[in-house]
């Protein structure tokens, strides 16, 4: 059995929510089946699996195809696809989960300094392949965010920094049941470090537990999102929680 994920390694994405993340196009009357179109870029091709493409083009560059096809098998972005990412070279955001995006209503949009979704989070240069995949060479995932050999391990790019860091603040009345709210401190945040610690001051053990509890409740799915026939079944993403120490 693979080890369970550490809550400090990534924000929680409930398994029940995978089915409502993204989109899929299926043939009428034959749900989940697709015609094989050799003209569609093969996600397994070496160029599409390179670090450069994964970090700076995967689900960023627009797909040149106009015909309906399986978006999960295509490395390009499609209009309306939730897996679409912002180019980290063009937009300044860090590999820290956006707390507003979980409600599907981050008012900052592309100007937000935090990652919107699984792909922006794990394909960010500060995180992509900076950890080893527990499955190693046995990994069968078409797109894995982790390294499968020592030579694939990357050093986190320190230039991707965030101005804000989350800290738990004791609320005086109101707030959630724990009497804790979240505050953003205007200070440097190194995305290569654990989201539990930032700046010069370390949180005490009690604050760490509170912060981890807050992060464990985070998700990337719009709470008001209504599934449609264009939804993408990403049940295969249950491997995320299994592959992170």
Swiss-Prot record:
Subcellular location: Nucleus
Any single GO BP term: cell differentiation
GO MF, one annotated term: DNA binding
GO cellular component, one term: nucleus
Region Disordered, annotated ranges: 175-204
Keyword annotations from UniProtKB, A to Z: Differentiation, DNA-binding, Metal-binding, Nucleus, Transcription, Transcription regulation, Zinc, Zinc-finger
Protein origin, superkingdom: Eukaryota
Zinc finger annotations (C3H1-type) as residue ranges: 92-119
PROSITE patterns named among the record's database cross-references: ZF_C3H1
Pfam families found in the cross-reference section: zf-CCCH (PF00642), zf-CCCH_AtC3H23 (PF25512)
InterPro entries noted in UniProt: Unkempt-like, Znf_CCCH
Main location: nucleus
Residue runs in coiled coils: none
Expression sites by tissue: Specifically expressed in embryo (at protein level).
Function in brief: Embryo-specific transcription factor required at the globular to heart stage transition in embryo development.
Note, other: Plants lacking PEI1 produce white seeds in which embryo development does not progress through heart stage.
Subunit structure as annotated in this protein's UniProt entry: Interacts with MARD1/FLZ9 and RD21A.
The protein's name in its UniProt record: Zinc finger CCCH domain-containing protein 54
Organism the protein comes from: Arabidopsis thaliana (Mouse-ear cress)
């Amino acid at each position: 059995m693979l080890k369970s994920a550490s809550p400090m390694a990534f924000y929680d994405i409930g398994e029940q929510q995978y089915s409502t993340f993204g989109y899929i196009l299926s043939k009428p009357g034959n749900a989940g089946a697709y015609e094989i179109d050799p003209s569609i870029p093969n996600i397994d091709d070496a160029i599409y699996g390179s670090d450069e493409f994964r970090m700076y083009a995967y689900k960023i560059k627009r797909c040149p195809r106009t015909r309906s096809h399986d978006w999960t098998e295509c490395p390009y972005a499609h209009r309306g696809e939730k897996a679409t990412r912002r180019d980290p070279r063009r937009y300044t955001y860090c590999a820290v989960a956006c707390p507003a995006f979980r409600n599907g209503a981050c008012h900052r949009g592309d100007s937000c300094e935090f990652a919107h979704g699984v792909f922006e989070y794990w394909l960010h240069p500060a995180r992509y392949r900076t950890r080893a995949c527990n499955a190693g060479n046995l990994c069968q995932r078409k797109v894995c965010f982790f390294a499968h050999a020592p030579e694939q391990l990357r050093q986190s790019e320190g230039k991707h920094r965030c101005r804000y860091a989350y800290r738990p603040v004791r609320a005086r009345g109101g707030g959630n049941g724990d009497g804790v709210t979240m505050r953003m401190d205007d200070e440097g945040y190194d995305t290569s470090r654990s989201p539990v610690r930032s700046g010069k001051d370390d949180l005490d053990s009690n604050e760490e537990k509170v912060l981890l509890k807050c992060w464990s409740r985070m998700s990337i799915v719009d709470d008001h999102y209504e599934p449609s026939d264009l939804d993408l079944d990403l049940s295969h993403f249950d491997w995320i929680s299994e592959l992170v120490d």
